[in-house]
Amino acid sequence: MRIGFDNEKYIKLQAEHIRERIGQFGGKLYLEFGGKLFDDYHASRVLPGFAPDAKISMLKSLIDEVEIVIAINANDIEKSKVRGDLGITYDEDVLRLMDIFRSMGFMVGNVVITQYANQPDADAFRKRLTSMGITSYLHYPIAGYPYDIDRIVSDEGYGKNEFIETSRPLVVVTAPGPGSGKMATCLSQLYHENKRGVAAGYAKYETFPIWNLPLNHPVNIAYEAATVDLDDDNIIDPFHLEAYGETTVNYNRDVEIFPVLKSMMERIQGESPYKSPTDMGVNMAGMAIVDDEACREAAEMEIVRRYFQTAVELKRTGVGEKWLAKLEMLMNRASVNVNLSPARSAALLKEETTGAPAGAMQLPDGTVVTGKTGPLLGAASALLMNALKGVSGVDDKLDVISDEVLEPICHLKTEHLKSQNPRLHSDETLLALSISSVTNPIAEQLIDNADKLRGCDAYFSVIISSTDEKLYRTLGINVCCEPKYEQHRYYHK
């Protein structure tokens, strides 16, 4: 992988900048933490060299100065809102986050339940927190929010909210997902701190869009592609342009709410420390890009991946037609198309010549390998085997797993487990490869080289099974599928 981002430089710069911002406000900063704190694979894909855990590593460098508050919207508890990427409810994710933070040595003990209006499930969750020894606080709906500044910044607004007791100079406010009330929590705390005579400030930390990259830089376009379902648009920050004569990039929701936010801060603190939404941010990611072309190429690939993901989701659910149209527009803006990766045309050609579903993958050295549907292995399994051979320097015609190993597994599937598909999925193929490695050193070599496939792009001529897709993602392989099924059925796993 061609490195375009200096992760160590980023961690150092980011920590220094946050410390500067703490000092700017007299020693106390409420930092709204947007996006993913850990496992930020989008950032690692579009900024090659960015570690998925870079943000949490940066926070660990400030560990003695930071404490964490987790916000959750009472309405999300009531609706049992689920995190799509994890398949767990927001309230369960609060507990998961607390476990992770604590295991890393962070000070985390406070949960704030926002938009609380006596929701029964929120009451039950609070009782559960109390039984675990976790302190929780209630923040209430405010009539006229966010535009009725007089009411909001008063004893009838933020004044009604419970003050969250904190002791460290940096208070990171995070949440299971968007709409949890992170910003409102920070501003409510500023109101209460100010009434107590404590100097404190607010800032926002989000990786994307990167404010000091051009509006139409592929990295920023890739952010729009990733959030296409949120209707986020990157725009030039007009407030920053007017105040400083500098062109910077922000997203539409932050720009739209800035005049209101500025008025709130003026009311709370007497004056606003910020002249623009860009001023509010602390993101230093743009300063750590060391190879712009590498980041451009990586981001272009991500835009195309998002297109295929959305096209497949539209085929599966019937939802997302307008999102797909927007992604086509974003691809045009980035001057890329669906054939950006040579693996796609290779997969389609393989299907055309064999008359059955096929796949292709571009390996780290740029070579493209293919996999076809056979009597014992599906396309995903065949491609995985050929890719492992490719990165291991093994002849792709060599049968590393003998039919004597494969056939009993296929027999078990069809005769005893009553599967209609005798072919092995990719996870089953890896197990067969593992069994073979006991007596076959080449099989062991293939397993040892599996990590070399991380970051590769695989394309399939049909939508592959969820089992195969999950295994590929576990190996760190990016998967794109043509939006069509192998068989015409109403139900697909």
Residue positions per predicted region:
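Short clusters of small/polar residues that mark proteolytic maturation junctions
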Residues: 372-373
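The conserved Walker
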Residues: 177-178
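Hydrophobic positions on the alpha1 helix immediately C-terminal to the Walker A/P-loop
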Residues: 185
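A short, polar/charged loop-to-alpha-helix boundary motif
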Residues: 376-392
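Short HxH-centered metal-ligating active-site micro-motif
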Residues: 390-422
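Flexible phosphate-sensing "switch/lid" loops adjacent to ATP/NTP-binding sites
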Residues: 1-173, 189-351, 356, 363-365, ...
